[in-house]
């Protein structure tokens, strides 16, 4: 992982790899906590959006093989209240959501994660600390809920080179300026690939 200074004491932007996200998931401690990690890292939900989603917000697309997750009130920078959006829901995450609903007898209107925004952030912090304790890598202690969304954006924009307009639509970004930081930050694998076969003179 790569740490980027924010200019504030002991606060960093953390650029995770998928392998590091998997490591966090292995130390989640519960299925609910793992869902929080997945909704942030694979679906791109913000901390305040995660408690909004319920089983009734999962929709199958017309082709029958893809899913969307309706976010009722996403971020709206215009100040007119939350903006709904349909996030792309990977099939593996949909299966885990469905299984969690069945195991916990959730009604269609019950939230998958019955926490406040600060509660979601606290879960990620606890999981990050537990991961640091178990792996001996203290960089994990800096991981926040927003870093999960950062991995989501970097995966699509840099690793997969997806059309930025698609990423903006499913992730709830209003402008190219908002996603530019993700476009300009190569992932660890992209850096490794760039140096393959390069003569460094040593």
Residue ranges of predicted features:
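DNA breakage-rejoining catalytic core of tyrosine-based enzymes
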Residues: 1-22, 78-90, 106-107
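Short Lys/Arg-enriched helix C-cap and helix-to-coil transition segments
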Residues: 70-74, 192-198
């Amino acid at each position: 992982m790569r740490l980027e200074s924010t200019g504030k004491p002991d606060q960093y932007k953390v650029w995770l790899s998928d392998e590091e996200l998997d490591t966090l998931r292995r130390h989640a401690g519960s299925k609910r906590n793992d869902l929080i990690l997945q909704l942030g890292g694979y679906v791109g939900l913000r901390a305040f959006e995660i408690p909004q989603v319920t089983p009734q917000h999962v929709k199958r697309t017309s082709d029958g093989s893809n899913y969307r997750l309706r976010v009722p009130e996403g971020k709206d920078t215009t100040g007119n209240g939350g903006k709904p959006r349909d996030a792309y829901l990977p099939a593996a995450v949909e299966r885990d959501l469905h299984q969690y609903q069945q195991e916990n007898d959730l009604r269609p209107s019950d939230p998958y994660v019955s926490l406040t925004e600060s509660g979601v952030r606290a879960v990620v912090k606890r999981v990050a600390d537990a991961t640091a304790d178990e792996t001996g890598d203290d960089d994990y202690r800096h991981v926040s809920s927003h870093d999960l969304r950062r991995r989501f954006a970097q995966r699509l924009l840099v690793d997969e080179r997806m059309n930025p307009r698609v990423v903006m639509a499913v992730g709830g970004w209003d402008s190219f300026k908002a996603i530019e930081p993700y476009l300009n930050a190569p992932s660890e694998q992209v850096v490794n690939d760039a140096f393959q076969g390069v003569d460094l003179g040593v």
